[in-house]
Amino acid sequence: MKCPFCGHSNTQVLDTRMSEDGDAVRRRRRCEACDRRFTTYERIELFFPAIVKKNGSRVDYSRAKLKDSMRLALRKRPVSAEAIDEAITRIEEKLLALGQKEIPSSQVGELVMRELRKLDKIAYIRFASVYRSFEDVAEFSDVLAEVTSGNSKR
């Protein structure tokens, strides 16, 4: 491992541990040339599928973008940041389990809607109204009826 301070290529590992959340190996290192210490983290690199938008363009998957859209739907709702992160992790696990290089944005939207429905019905309706581009009040009423009756058409 190259020293970030002097660029020397020989470093000694002083300590190795799992990170608190268990998703990385934390290593404390010392440079043999300048004697400075630094920490490195070793993580598994995951490759998410590219997202194919409705217009046919492709964009890289973005956890931040997904989180922003869920936060917007959950704005001023009693849902913790931890619950949002857990929902996003479940969505990501499903995306990785598909094993595909590309997936349509509509499929991601449906996964988001399922998770929002579990978290908060109001947020689900907010997201659905934008995501499904309701044309009239009848479509909105259908989703409201679906949520209040506890049935799911999708």
From Swiss-Prot:
Belongs to the NrdR family. PANTHER family: TRANSCRIPTIONAL REPRESSOR NRDR. Pfam families: ATP-cone, Zn_ribbon_NrdR. Residues 49-139 form the ATP-cone domain. GO terms for biological process: negative regulation of DNA-templated transcription. It comes from the Bacteria. Negatively regulates transcription of bacterial ribonucleotide reductase nrd genes and operons by binding to NrdR-boxes. This is Transcriptional repressor NrdR. Coiled coil: none annotated. GO terms for molecular function: ATP binding; DNA binding; zinc ion binding. A zinc finger (unnamed) spans 3-34. Disulfide bonds: none annotated. The keyword Transport does not apply. The keyword Transcription applies. InterPro entries: ATP-cone_dom, NrdR-like_N, RNR_NrdR-like. Its cofactor is Zn(2+). Keywords: ATP-binding, DNA-binding, Metal-binding, Nucleotide-binding, Repressor, Transcription, Transcription regulation, Zinc, Zinc-finger. Binds 1 zinc ion.
